[in-house]
Amino acid sequence: MTEISSMVITHAKATVEEMEDSWHGDIDLVLSQLYSNELVYECAVLKTCNRVEIYVVSSKGSSVLFHYAKEMGVSAKIVEFYDHDESLRHLLRLACGLESMIIGEDQILGQIKDFFLMAKGAGTVGKVLSTAFSKAIQVGKRVRTETFINRGAVSIASAAVDLAEDILDGLNDKHILVIGTGEMGTLVTRALSHRDMHVIYLANRTYEKARDLAEELGGEAVMFDQLEKYVRAADVVISATSAPHYVLKGDLVAKVMEGRENELLLIDIASPRDIDPAVEEIPHVILRNIDGLRVINEKNLQMRMVEAKKAEIIIDDELDMVKAQYKRQKADAIISNLYSQSHGLRHNEMEHAINKLSAYHTIGEIERKVLEDLTHAITNKILAEPTKKLRNAAEYDDDKFLDSVSRLFDIRPIKKNDGITK
């Protein structure tokens, strides 16, 4: 039987560097690599600044992911493998913000939706993963409506700003440079705009995007090729681009710091990292990345733990419902195949009988309709009781019965992407 398995690497066990080392290529490439495996029926990938997660639907369970992790050189110390039920629970908890570094944060829900749509667009998800991800998105919304799990929660972006405030004992008289005006950079700028900043510089490779964000939230847009000038002017640099390489290299920062005695705080919340870790060796430079945000999370964690317990109750309830849905799907796939094969045989035999009768009598539309209705009714009545038994078996997890019926009626494997059994 084909079910969901998942491979999860997160901030809980892995450092930023280890997560970078575990990722090879862009999302489309990874989806393509996974889906090209004949044992994988469906697949989806989640990749954020503090997690890499892969979900597959396969008759071989986690063994497909064990092999993939080995090929990618992923250390066993940082990866978790989940079976079907564990994968479902994890995905629901993730959508509710319970697996996030910042418990209850809202950004993860949008990320799950985006990555699901990406896999859908690539044609790598079918019925099984669509059910799981749709349920996760629904539950994430329900938990945020029925609890206060996200009250007081901060995003990675606002946590970066809070961290800067803690390290520098306030930001009121500071010059801040934000590099990157994508989703994360916009969130950083928005968090800064709520504070009384001296000046915020916004840098992006596409100047117009920086200019538009500066006009919307306040700040000064700067040309990307003048980065050195504005790093020199800044007290804090928060970098959040999607570049595949370092945006702030060691030699640039070293040049900026020549003769400078006041500290320069660099906060890197990009994935992969934007800032060369070697800059930490430069005098008066303070470097922090995702790993350093844990302290901020601890500050407001306690107030959300009561709400987290309420969320767990909702998750338990919704998990039971989605598991029941999968049970129905399991039986429905066999039933659909059974009806399809049976009616195919019925139609062929009816046509054979009509051809024989046509040798002796003229078979008109009325006679053909009578034979069609008769054979259709007989076939459906014969299948009615087996259908009931199959649905009962699925409800009570009687996989042996389901498998026996499949073998008895020689129900052939379904095509890749239908995703219930193989």
Curated annotation (Swiss-Prot):
One of its GO terms (molecular function) is NADP binding. GO terms for biological process: protoporphyrinogen IX biosynthetic process from glutamate. Pfam families: GlutR_dimer, GlutR_N, Shikimate_DH. Its EC number is 1.2.1.70. It catalyses: (S)-4-amino-5-oxopentanoate + tRNA(Glu) + NADP(+) = L-glutamyl-tRNA(Glu) + NADPH + H(+). It comes from the Archaea. During catalysis, the active site Cys acts as a nucleophile attacking the alpha-carbonyl group of tRNA-bound glutamate with the formation of a thioester intermediate between enzyme and glutamate, and the concomitant release of tRNA(Glu). The thioester intermediate is finally reduced by direct hydride transfer from NADPH, to form the product GSA. HAMAP family: Glu_tRNA_reductase. This is Glutamyl-tRNA reductase.
